[in-house]
UniProtKB/Swiss-Prot annotation:
It is found in: Cytoplasm. Belongs to the class I-like SAM-binding methyltransferase superfamily. rRNA adenine N(6)-methyltransferase family. RsmA subfamily. GO terms for molecular function: 16S rRNA (adenine(1518)-N(6)/adenine(1519)-N(6))-dimethyltransferase activity; RNA binding. It is an enzyme of class 2 (transferase). S-adenosyl-L-methionine binds at residues 19, 21, 46, 67, 92, 113. InterPro entries: KsgA/Erm, rRNA_Ade_diMease-like_C, rRNA_Ade_Mease_Trfase_CS, rRNA_Ade_methylase_Trfase_N, rRNA_adenine_dimethylase, SAM-dependent_MTases_sf. SMART domains: rADc (SM00650). GO terms for cellular component: cytosol. Its main location: cytoplasm. It catalyses: adenosine(1518)/adenosine(1519) in 16S rRNA + 4 S-adenosyl-L-methionine = N(6)-dimethyladenosine(1518)/N(6)-dimethyladenosine(1519) in 16S rRNA + 4 S-adenosyl-L-homocysteine + 4 H(+). This is Ribosomal RNA small subunit methyltransferase A.
Length: 271
């Protein structure tokens, strides 16, 4: 058993995408950015060996955790300081119904060091509960954080950017080097804060259409808007919507994507 795969007696499981955070300075920075307070409806995804769970547990009385690895869930159940504070849900966060954690007038505050192999689909799952969430703090691949926070005209701007910014304000918090983990991942990491809007600034009448215009555009990034959407919208219709047909999809703002989606929803039967 190689020592670089083992932390606190637990061997990292590749199939769960486990990399355990072990840098006290970084841990302190993450917990400070979360700023957990007693009485808040806190939920940690993938607590692992408790790098964030333990310091958060010192600041609050009760919170929930979702852990897929049975061995790690068992460790938490027997943790001398955390056992009485935690409500442990054993299972896959990708399939978890977060509405079961809703409390009156106490929105969810979700945080975690997400497995990088599922981080993007997991965020899409979490966005479906956006109206019940106050904020989310996640450790992700730095490249994913760059995509979340990107603006139009930048290489990192894509479908994930548009969908994340449709639901929330995106704030990069801090960067994390590979040596802050055991085992060290092959990529740089970063922490991001996602704060869902109480009122969506650019509401879409049918999210299937928004997803479709994003997919069709960003799957053909080098094509112009007129060529990406020629089966859906004429040049005149694009111009009426304030979209320059000579631009590429990466130059289109969130508001323009929503305008296109809403027009298509009003004028076509199925997304």
């Amino acid at each position: 058993m190689s020592s670089d795969q083992v932390h606190l007696g637990h061997r990292a499981r590749k199939r769960f995408g486990q990399n355990f955070l072990n840098d006290p300075y970084i841990i302190d920075g993450i917990v400070s950015s979360i700023n957990p307070l007693p009485g808040q409806n806190l939920v940690e995804i993938g607590p692992g060996l408790g790098a964030l769970t333990e310091p958060v547990g010192r600041l609050v009385d009760k919170f929930s955790v979702i852990e897929l690895d049975r061995d790690l869930a068992k460790r938490l159940r027997h943790h001398p300081d955390l056992a009485d504070k935690l409500t442990i849900y054993e299972g896959d966060a990708m399939r978890f119904d977060f509405t079961q954690l809703i409390k009156p007038n106490n929105k969810l505050r979700i945080f975690g060091n997400l497995p990088y192999n599922i981080s993007t689909p997991l965020m899409f799952h979490l966005f479906t509960f956006h109206e019940h969430v106050e904020d989310m703090h996640f450790m992700l691949q730095k490249e994913v954080v760059n995509r979340l926070a990107a603006g139009p005209g930048c290489k990192a701007y894509g479908r994930l950017t548009v969908m994340a910014q449709y639901y929330s304000r995106v704030t990069p918090v801090l960067e994390v080097p590979p040596e802050s983990f055991t085992p060290a991942p092959k990529v740089d990491s970063a922490v991001v804060r996602l704060t869902p809007y109480e009122v969506l600034p650019h509401p879409c009448t049918n999210l299937k259409w928004l997803d479709r215009v994003c997919r069709e555009g960003f799957n053909q990034r080098r094509k112009t808007i007129r060529n990406c959407y020629k089966a859906l919208l004429t040049v005149e219709q694009l111009e009426d919507l304030g979209v320059n047909p000579g631009l590429r999809p990466e130059n289109i703002t969130l508001q323009q994507f929503v305008k296109m989606a809403n027009w298509l929803d009003a004028n076509h039967q199925n997304a």
